[in-house]
Amino acid sequence: MKSILQQPIWRYYDQSISAKQRSPLESFATDDTLCQLVGQLVSPPTIRTWVHEASVVLGIQDHRLPYVQQGMDLLESRGYQPIVRNSGGLAVVLDEGILNISIVLSEQMDSLSINDGYDVMVDLVKGLFPEVAEKIEAYEIVGSYCPGSYDLSIEGKKFAGISQRRLRQGVAVQIYLCIEGSGSQRAALIRDFYEESLQQEETKFNYPQIVPEVMASLSELVDLHLTVEGVVIRLQQLLHRLAGEVHPESFHDEELTLYGFYLKRVFERNAKMLERHE
């Protein structure tokens, strides 16, 4: 376990239940707010857990698909709410079997390279699942949705993807952990979205050719009874081992004002993206 996870104080913001019925855009605004607060040393380093109901978060490149509206209609017909985010990255699935974790750190005292940021999250995940830590590998899983060099897998099957957000000297390292349900069914949903949105038309950007069988949930990969709720408890226990103090804290009044600023910005940018498409 790298020393960067061993902090005198970890702030812990649990939205694994409270965020479920809210828009994922609210989670992006929350992490932007935490980036500024932690980056400017107003808040201690923070770990946030969050879960949303069935949604698919699309990136800028996804929104440029030639028939993206048909693709979004397909997602809605399958019970998933499409959300467009004004950022890089490609389509990812959110639902109640997926636990998202954000680690928010400050670069004000020490810079954190891109790879170091990813490594912190890999270490956290291995700490969460010591029973299978040696089996967890980080490399790009070709055929998965939103592929990246820090895809986490066991025996070639991806169960998690990591991204980063940097703002106001703060770094938010974010992971989606597929804990419950079928990873291949989620991948098939995104495969169908791309097929409907491309309709065999050639594009300059190479969208992923998704092979559902290369994705799985942790419940499918390990001989453990895992639930989202249970993994949240594992995380809380791990934090208490890593930190001198753990402060469970949501936003207080002054922080809510800043959150309101970022929330407005996120929703305005999302609206502009949708306007451009229309």
UniProtKB/Swiss-Prot annotation:
The record marks K158 as: Lowers pKa of active site Cys. The active site is at C146 (acyl-thioester intermediate). Its EC number is 2.3.1.204. One of its GO terms (biological process) is protein modification process. The reaction proceeds via a thioester-linked acyl-enzyme intermediate. It comes from Lysinibacillus sphaericus (strain C3-41). Belongs to the octanoyltransferase LipL family. Catalyzes the amidotransfer (transamidation) of the octanoyl moiety from octanoyl-GcvH to the lipoyl domain of the E2 subunit of lipoate-dependent enzymes. Keywords: Acyltransferase, Transferase. InterPro entries: aa-tRNA-synth_II/BPL/LPL, BPL_LPL_catalytic, LipL, Octanoyltrans_LipM/LipL. This is Octanoyl-[GcvH]:protein N-octanoyltransferase. SUPFAM superfamilies: Class II aaRS and biotin synthetases. Residues 41-247 form the BPL/LPL catalytic domain. It catalyses: N(6)-octanoyl-L-lysyl-[glycine-cleavage complex H protein] + L-lysyl-[lipoyl-carrier protein] = N(6)-octanoyl-L-lysyl-[lipoyl-carrier protein] + L-lysyl-[glycine-cleavage complex H protein]. Gene3D superfamilies: Bira Bifunctional Protein, Domain 2. GO terms for molecular function: lipoyl(octanoyl) transferase activity.
